[in-house]
Amino acid sequence: MTSVHESAVGTRHSPTPPPDPTHLTGGEALVRALAAHGITQAFGIPGTHNLEIYRHLTAYGLAHIAPRHEQGAGYAADAYARVTGTPGVAITTTGPALLNIAAAVGQAYSDSVPLLVISPGMPLRHPRQSTGLLHEMRSQSEALRNVAAFSHRVSSVAEIGAAVARAFTLFRSERPRPAHIEIPLDLLEATEPAGPVRTAPPAAPRVPDAVRIEEAAALLARAERPALVLGGGARGAGAQCLALAEQLAAPVVTTANGKALVDEDHPLSLGVSLHSPAVQEWLTSRDVVLAVGTELAESDIWTAEPLPLQGELIRVDLDPAQMYAGLPADVPLVGDAAATLDALTVALDLGLALETAVAAGHTVTADPTTAHTETVALKAARDDESRPRDAHWLPYLEAIRGALAPDAVVTSDSAQCCYYGALPHLTLGRRARYLHPTGFGTLGYALPAAIGAKAACPDRQVVALSGDGGLQFSIQELATAAALQQPLAVVVFDNSGYGEIRDEMNARGDAPLAVDHARVDLAALARAYGGHGATAHSPEELAKLLSTALITPAPTLIVVPEESA
């Protein structure tokens, strides 16, 4: 049975320095390598097999937060990484603990989040068959390889630093995705030569070759109906995206992970609208589409079939495989989003692309007025499509928006109130962040992600949005937020069950089964965990409760009953 410290922060121990500083235990070699890469925060749960790691955290300057479940640790570390741009680190013990965090690793893989998961593993000479060891698995690494970019099982203490450097090289120079490092139990406690500290070198931003840049710029210069689609891979390039959109008078639509890259009140912004039939029809009629850092995936367009674009597609992505996945690029630009868009802007500013376009008989003048009018009409069409389904959430979303500072962080769950409601309708500025579990679509993300985001930026407001079904996958993390005295607002739209699945069963003509739950007093449960709980029966009540929750040093769970919304 796993030994767990009950404190949310965990007990900190000062290590006894080894007699020979060149010889370290595997646990200390690991923590030394993390500190050398600038890691100052870890998430995880201490257990019998990982105590040698925990023994050294404080001495090397790593703070630690212990959620109440390993998935919570994974989601918190994921959000920490998304908000800071620094890899999130999560520590588990062996076996069931590692499998518990696997869902969070899969979510980070889907959303291209730099998450490093570290666990002990079976001893080096483990026979890979049942011998009755505590938490025994035949191969943890094989399990994690299915949801991570790689799983690295080290074979010596000296190899630990190299494994950490390998993970940070991935995070810095390739499409960032989660990695797992496994340290065999006998190495974790063994004292061996650790070798020098190895750190991954900084990577220069990758830029496509000049020929490709000029080809793309020429297409954009002669485009009569350009459009931009921005995904999570454009994060960090919001200013370049907006400048290019204004230069081209091109409306901008974002994916869920690209939400608020461009101010959603901007006259050219369509916000998160790829799922809208009206916006899809408009997008397919564009003569040039510039897609930056997006898979153009089913999770954003809500259909398994690729969009039938009639024009030419320019794709900017750090991952070469994306150029031919789903919708193949007519002009593939493999590179860092910000650096690539800078190069495109320079090519357009120099007039080289325009000269090429004029020589080909094309003369186009960007017309912002027409583009602004088009954007207003498309937003109205999108809202008309969804009003029967979404209208009841809108006043509550306006109340939430009114309570938010410009740089607030909003976390959400795979819940109707989020993907139908907040993603398209909660309008945010580009200083804000919206964190959503796209693609893999796990439940229970919002609350632990809010804890990780608040740890990353304690001076920013953090609000979690969820449904009652999703929240109860991780509701125990209210205890973590309460122990940390985090002023979090957790807004829960309560329909007493799994509303989306209930609706799908009804649409199929099936009798709803296993989707209706007895209503739980979630507000009372929040108080039992050490936070505050209340119910909002109107948008006005929600606004009032939020204003208090965001300055109260404890989590506040606000229930909005579905019948009220």
Listing of model-derived features with the role each one plays in the protein:
Residues 27-30, 35, 45-48, 53-58, ...:
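Active-site diphosphate/adenylate-binding microenvironment
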Residues 2-6, 10-21, 158, 223, ...:
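Phosphate/pyrophosphate-binding active-site segments
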Residues 51-123, 127-135, 247, 283, 288, 293-297, 324-326, 419-497, ...:
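Thiamine diphosphate
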Residues 82, 232-314, 428-460, 473-476, ...:
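Glycine-rich, anion-gripping cofactor-binding loops and their flanking helix/strand elements
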Residues 120-163, 256-372, 505:
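Glycine-rich, acidic loop regions that bind phosphate or pyrophosphate groups
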Residues 2-4, 40-41, 82-119, 143-196, ...:
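Structural signature of the thiamine diphosphate
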Residues 3-7, 15, 185-211:
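Aromatic-enriched
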